Amino acid sequence: MSKLQEKFEIKTYQCNEFGKMKLRHLFDCFQELASDHADRLGVGYEECLKKNCAWVCAKYHVIIDKLPKFKDKITIETYPSKFVGPTGIREFKVFDDNGNILIKGVSQWVLIGLERLRPLIVQNIFDCSKIELEESMEIPLDKMGSVESYNFEEMKDLRYDDVDVNHHINNAIYISLCEDALFENLKQEFDVSEISVDFKKSAVLSDKKVLVKSLFVDKNCDFTITKDDSSVDFARINIKLKP
């Protein structure tokens, strides 16, 4: 099974006050499909536990033509396109009920050993010869710099509800923090055209708080989410808004 598709109907809790799907829940869906597909391909959570390793999401680049709305029926498709060294590339497409592409994106995952927390060569741990790779959309995954100067910052509490099965703050929470900062600054509805994410280190509940630093220039929004004293970057995120 080189591709996995799953149908969704957008629920009320997945939408913002304007009836559009929250970015956080879009990334929730991506995470769930990635996990489910990895299980089916024999490289998922349970197999990783047996080999004392884990997949860690490192990057996303998502291009949004249109966000689904409340009660919309969509299909999300995911597939692997490449394994290189310790990394695997996984891509996503979101279709509307008529088969039109609403959203497309690419993600990079790193296989790490749980004992030393160091990257592992994927081909040395798993037999990937039977995994059929699909052609890549060639969406770039660029390295992102930290926000050094910023025009907005806010301290946010971490909650027990933010923690996932891996015992750290779920990746989608960082997206939600950026959505909050966007609305705090714009005070109105906004449309996102593109999101790039560079996860640097996993926050845990004992961190208690994170600092969200934002730089807004026209339709370009840069975020760095750090430890409360700015000593550690947890995530760097760029969001581009539509005109």
List where the protein language model places each region.
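Hot-dog-fold acyl-thioester-processing enzymes
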Residues: 1-57, 102-106, 113-191
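Small beta-barrel nucleic-acid-binding modules, principally OB-folds
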Residues: 52-67, 190-202
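HotDog/MaoC-like acyl-thioester-processing domains
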Residues: 1-5, 61-146, 203-206, 215-243
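Acidic/His-leaning functional-site neighborhoods
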Residues: 156-239
